[in-house]
C-alpha cells in the first residue's frame, strides 16, 4: 500500500482558506464537507487557485495552454494558477482529491492520470454546468470530445449538485453512468436560519442577488423600472449604477469569492426582503441554486425561472414552496411580483413550506455524509 501524507486534498477557488480561518460566522456549504471531515480526524489539505511559485516561463506556457484548450474545446482551464511542482506533489501524496468545480477538475485531470499509473488516487469532481455544452464548429466538437472522454475516464466520481444535469448526463453518457453521483447542493441550516418567525408586515422590498452570468440582469433592471412602487435591492457585481433606470433600486456591490459582504450581512438582506427574485436564462447550469436555498432557509419566498437546469423538480412544487415562471417576459414577471407582493397569506404559506422543504431535504449534513461514502478510506 502506497503511503499518503493527506487523506483528502481539497482544490478550491481562491478565498476559501481565508474564510475558514476567519472568526466571522459564515455558511459552510461551499466547503463541500471540509468542516465535517475536519472533526473526524481525516488528514486534510487545501490548495487554492492563486499565483503559484513557478518560473516565469512555466507560467507563460500554462497560460498559453489554458487559452489554447479553452478556445478550441470551449471548456474551462485554470492551469496557470494551479500547476506547480509543489501543488503536484501535494496531489500525488493525497489519497482523495476533491475539486470544488469542474474547471479545476479539468485543469488537473491530465496530471492525475499520470499519477494514477504509480498509485491509487481517488479523484472526485464536484460540478454544476459541465454538461451545458455550447454549440460550436466541428473542430471544437472533435477536440472537446477527445478531452471530455479522457476526463471522464480519469475521474472516479462526478458529483452533480443539480438533479436536472445529472439526469441529462445519465441519459447521454451511459458508458460512464457508474461514475455519476447526484448529491443535491445543501446548505448550512445552522447558519441560514431565521432569527424569528418571518413577519411579512415587517418584511419590505424585493431582493435580487448574484453575479453568475446565466442570470438575466437586463430583465431585473426592467422589472424594477416597471414596478416603481416597490423597493428593490440588487446585490451583484454585474449591474452598475448607471445601468439602473429607476429610483427605487438600492444597488450593492456583491461577490461571494471577493467577500465584499459578510454572510451575516447577506443573511440580513434575505431576512428583510419580502421576496427574492432570480430570473435565469434557459440553461442546464443550475444558476441561482445556492441563493434560492439560502432565501428559502430564512423563510423568504422565491420567484425564479423554470429552466432545463432548475436544480430539483422532484422536491419543489410550483406555487407550494416556490414560484416558477415559464418564460422571462417582462409582463409575466412584473404581474407576478405585483400580485404576490401584497398577498400576505400566500407569502406566509410559501415561507412555511419552503422552510419545511429545506429542513427535510437540504441540510448540509446530508451532503457531507453522502460524500463520505465515496472516499477512498
Residue ranges and their predicted role:
Residues 339, 343, 360-377:
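C-terminal alpha-helical cap of glycosyltransferases
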Residues 155-178, 189-191:
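A short, active-site helix/loop in glycosyltransferases that binds the activated sugar's phosphate group
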Residues 85-93, 118, 138-158:
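Membrane-proximal helix-turn-helix segments that form the acceptor-binding/catalytic region
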Residues 211, 316-330, 339-344:
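Conserved acidic donor-binding segment of nucleotide-sugar-dependent glycosyltransferases
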Residues 198-266:
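Conserved catalytic-core segment of nucleotide-activated headgroup transferases in glycan assembly
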Residues 332, 339, 346-360:
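A short, well-ordered alpha-helix in the C-terminal region of glycosyltransferases
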Residues 268-287, 300:
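Acidic donor-binding loop of glycosyltransferase active sites
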Residues 171, 184-203, 244:
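Acidic anion/phosphate-binding donor-loop and adjacent secondary structure
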